[in-house]
């Protein structure tokens, strides 16, 4: 059967719950137009009263509202909160429902009603998990695909649609579709789910941001070990790039012995290659880096070296002139 709870605009299909739980259902909880063999509309009202008076009714209602909250945009959540706040207190509602059931002579339902309510709550909890998975993966892909289509259209046409419009139909057709697909009673004509064909609305942006943060957290947790391995590999390569202690000592000894002119000749480099076991390129790179380090650390010595070079160049020039 399909019944409609006025305060929350919830359409519940108990036949689906019965099928999910292996066919266990209350005798009056089948059919779509009323209770099968339950006495028509009066029997249906009695069944509603029995459900509302059941101890698990509040839990069932909470599970159903939780399903609605999963994919509802943030800007639409106050509608659900307002409808819940407008309900009478649970105790008063249960008392009124029990009184109505007693006045109508409705059966209590017994174990079959208890079984139905229990399985329905479990079914809704499972449905909520499926919705969360859908929002986390498929809805995110759909929203991003719409956004990419809008960007492509804008790049091709140069036209920028109005924020939140995304209209691809005439106003009459758009209003007709909105009136048929409203999610809540008293909707103002906007899309209840908030997913426009082109532009992202505020609710969509909130949903995208929430899904993005969840995916970011999951990816970070999933790739944490790989990031640690990569970091260790980088540090290992850095450590491997340093020269051994005895090799560096040999080069530094030569440097200190020739600190006034730390430019080894080709014969010096060949001898250092034999002593250290390094390649000629490594020797050249070490002396280049060592000279840079000493230039920055001892500017006075570098300036004196430059002055010596200038004097030697000047002397060479005078010799050439005299010659």
From Swiss-Prot:
The keyword Chloroplast does not apply. One of its GO terms (biological process) is regulation of DNA-templated transcription. GO terms for molecular function: DNA binding. CDD domains: homeodomain. Pfam families: ELK, Homeobox_KN, KNOX1, KNOX2. Isoform 2 is expressed in roots, leaf blades, leaf sheaths and flowers. Isoform 4 is expressed in leaf blades and at lower levels in flowers. Gene3D superfamilies: Homeodomain-like (1.10.10.60). Residues 214-234 form the ELK domain. It comes from the Eukaryota. Keywords: DNA-binding, Homeobox, Nucleus. InterPro entries: ELK_dom, HD, Homeodomain-like_sf, KN_HD, KNOX1, KNOX2, TALE_homeobox. GO terms for cellular component: nucleus. It is found in: Nucleus. Residues 235-298 bind DNA. Belongs to the TALE/KNOX homeobox family. This is Homeobox protein knotted-1-like 11. It comes from Oryza sativa subsp. japonica. The gene is HOS59.
């Amino acid at each position: 059967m399909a019944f409609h709870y006025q305060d929350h605009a919830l359409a519940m299909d108990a036949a689906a719950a019965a099928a999910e739980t292996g066919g266990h259902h209350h005798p009056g909880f089948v059919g779509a137009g009323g209770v099968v063999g339950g006495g028509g509309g009066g029997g249906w009202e009695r069944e509603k009263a029995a459900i509302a008076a059941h101890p698990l009714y509040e839990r069932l209602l909470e599970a159903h509202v939780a399903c609605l909250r999963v994919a509802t945009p943030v800007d639409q959540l106050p509608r659900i909160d307002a409808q819940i706040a407008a309900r009478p207190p649970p105790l008063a509602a249960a008392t009124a429902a029990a009184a109505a059931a007693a006045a109508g002579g409705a059966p209590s339902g017994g174990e079959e009603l208890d079984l139905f309510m229990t399985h329905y709550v479990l079914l809704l909890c499972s449905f909520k998990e499926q919705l969360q998975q859908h929002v986390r993966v498929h809805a995110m892909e759909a929203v991003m695909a719409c956004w990419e289509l809008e960007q492509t259209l804008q790049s091709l046409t140069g036209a920028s649609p109005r924020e939140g419009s995304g209209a691809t139909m005439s106003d009459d057709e758009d209003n007709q579709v909105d009136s048929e697909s409203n999610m809540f009673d008293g909707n103002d004509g906007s899309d209840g789910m908030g997913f426009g064909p082109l532009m992202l609305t505020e609710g969509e942006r909130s949903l995208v941001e929430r899904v993005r943060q969840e995916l970011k957290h999951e990816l970070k947790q999933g790739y944490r070990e790989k990031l640690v391995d990569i970091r260790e590999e980088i540090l290992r390569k850095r450590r491997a790039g340093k020269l051994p202690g005895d090799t560096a000592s040999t080069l530094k000894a030569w440097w200190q012995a020739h600190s006034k002119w730390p430019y080894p000749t080709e014969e010096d480099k060949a001898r250092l290659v034999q002593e250290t076991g390094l390649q000629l390129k490594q020797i050249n790179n070490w002396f280049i880096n060592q000279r840079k380090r000493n230039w920055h650390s001892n500017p006075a010595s570098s300036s004196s070296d430059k002055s010596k070079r200038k004097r030697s160049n000047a002397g060479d020039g005078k010799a050439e002139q005299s010659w």
